[in-house]
Every structure is written in C-alpha cells, then in structure tokens.
From Swiss-Prot:
Function summary: Reductase; part of the gene cluster that mediates the biosynthesis of elsinochromes, pigments consisting of at least four interconvertible tautomers (A, B, C and D) that have a core phenolic quinone to which various side chains are attached and which play an important role in fungal pathogenesis. The non-reducing polyketide synthase PKS1 was proposed to iteratively catalyze decarboxylation between acetyl-CoA and malonyl-CoA subunits for polyketide chain elongation.
Listed EC numbers: 1.1.1.-
SUPFAM superfamilies per the UniProt record, alphabetical: NAD(P)-binding Rossmann-fold domains
Name of this chain's protein: Elsinochrome reductase 1
Length: 267
C-alpha cells in the first residue's frame, strides 16, 4: 500500500458526522478531528450556544464545514429532532459520536433518587436513544461511537457508584448493538477514557485523589501523571484521534469493542 492509499483510508471526505456534547472539552476535540479528516460536522450542544458556535467557527476557519444544533439528549424527543434536523440539513448522516455526559460523586448512603435519575438520564438512557436514532438515520456502513470511562472497567472508585454504573452499562450496550446494527453494516464501539485534561479536569480529578481537596492544580497534575507509565495526563486529542480512527475506513473491522484510552493508567 502506498503512502497516499494509507492516507486516504484515514480520511472522511464526503461523510457527515454528528457529535453530541461537542461545544467544549472532549466533544469539541472530536468534532474538530473529524472535520480535519474531511467530514462535515454537526456540533450538538445542550446549554452553551456560544461555545458550540466557537467550535463551528474554528472548523470553518480551517476550511471545514459544520453547523451547531441544540438538543438535550436526556429528552428523547429532542434527540429525535436532532437527528432529523441533521439529515434535513446535510442530506445524509454517516457517523454518530455520543459524547454528552455528566459526572457524579457521592457515598452510596447519600445518593438521592433525583441524582440517580439525573445521571442515568444522560449517561446511559441518553446514549441508548442516541444510538437508536443513529441506527435509524445512518447510511449503510456507518459508525456509532459511544462514550464509556475507565471507571466502568477499573477497580472500584470510592463515592462513584452511580457514575461508574452508567458507564459500565455502555460496554454491554455496544456488544449487543453491534449485532443489531449488522444488517446495515454499522459498527458500534465504545471509547473509555481515563482522566482527560478538560476545563472540568482539576475539580473532578481531586475526587479521585486521597485528600485531593488540599492539592493545588499543579500538584493534581503531578499526581495524576503517575497513574500512567507514560507519566503524563490524557488530553482531549488523545480521545479524538481514536474516534477518528474508528470513524474511518481504517477502523471498519473494529466492532462491538471497548477501547480504553488511558495510557495504561491504574488508579
């Protein structure tokens, strides 16, 4: 295979991608990476139109094509409309990346029904119905990528039962969905990041560290880097590149799998 042929299999020219929760952080990096590979991108947001438009503007400035569409994926009716509107605008949809999510910490004894429902509504139920609508709207040979977490795989994390449970369910989803989606040759996979340095990173990361509330942001970075033998923390681009691979022809034989993106971290 020539270098040109190898490059072409990583490209997404002519494809249309939808990324939920892509106004910032990991989602923004995924949307940008898919656009850099040639895809037109639907940048979804729930509550931050300015942030989403910033992502769209950056993609367009770099020669790409993108639009911002609002939808709260905890509301199935909004999810349905999101996919309908995406197809109405671009005429097709080939890639769906479910990135929307919320974090939650709390000892088992303190978890309320409201908190349980809030987290599952987005992280689990929301992702399920994003995948359902993706199956209905995607072209033959499309890609569905769901968002898991190292906490769905790693040893137990204190005060993290609800969040970890929402992510553990996603791993089972993709194994079963991959079979259901086979009739349209759609692959379904899960990316499971470890700690990724986004705007929420330091506040969340302190919850994983004993006495973390007493550490400065610099000390948090130093501590978190030791979780990986590569001695650094994860960046949004680390997740985005894997999503780009899965979305491309290069990833067409990866199906029903959970890909850990954690630098071999052991928390």
């Amino acid at each position: 295979m020539s270098a040109l042929q190898a490059l072409s299999t990583s490209r997404l020219d002519g494809k249309v991608a939808l990324v939920t929760g892509s106004g910032r952080g990991i989602g923004a990096a995924i949307a940008t990476e898919l656009a850099n590979r040639g895809a037109s991108v639907v940048v979804n947001y729930a509550n931050s139109p300015d942030a989403a438009q910033t992502v769209v503007d950056a993609i367009k400035k770099n020669g790409g094509d993108a639009i911002a569409l609002q939808a709260d994926v905890s509301d199935v009716k909004q999810t349905i409309k999101l996919f309908d509107d995406a197809v109405a605008h671009y005429g097709q949809l080939d890639i769906a990346v479910s990135n929307s999510g919320v974090v939650s910490f709390g000892h088992l004894k303190d978890v309320t029904e409201e908190e349980f429902d809030r987290v599952f509504a987005i992280n689990t139920r929301g992702q399920f119905f994003v995948a359902r609508e993706a199956y209905k709207h995607l072209s033959v040979g499309g890609r569905i990528i769901l968002m898991g977490s190292i906490t769905g795989q790693a040893k137990g994390v204190p005060k993290h039962t609800v969040y970890s449970g929402t992510k553990g369910a996603i791993e089972t989803f993709v194994r079963c969905m991959a079979i259901d989606c086979g009739d349209k040759r759609i692959t379904v996979n899960c990316v499971a990041p470890g700690g990724i340095k986004t705007d929420m990173y330091h506040a969340v990361c302190k919850e994983y560290i004993p006495n973390g509330e007493n550490l400065t942001n610099e000390q948090v970075d130093e501590y978190a880097a030791t979780w990986s033998p590569l001695n650094r923390v994860g960046q949004p681009i680390d997740v985005a590149r894997v999503c780009g691979f899965l979305a491309s022809q290069d990833g067409e034989w990866i199906n029903g799998k959970v890909l850990g993106i954690d630098g071999a971290a052991c928390m």
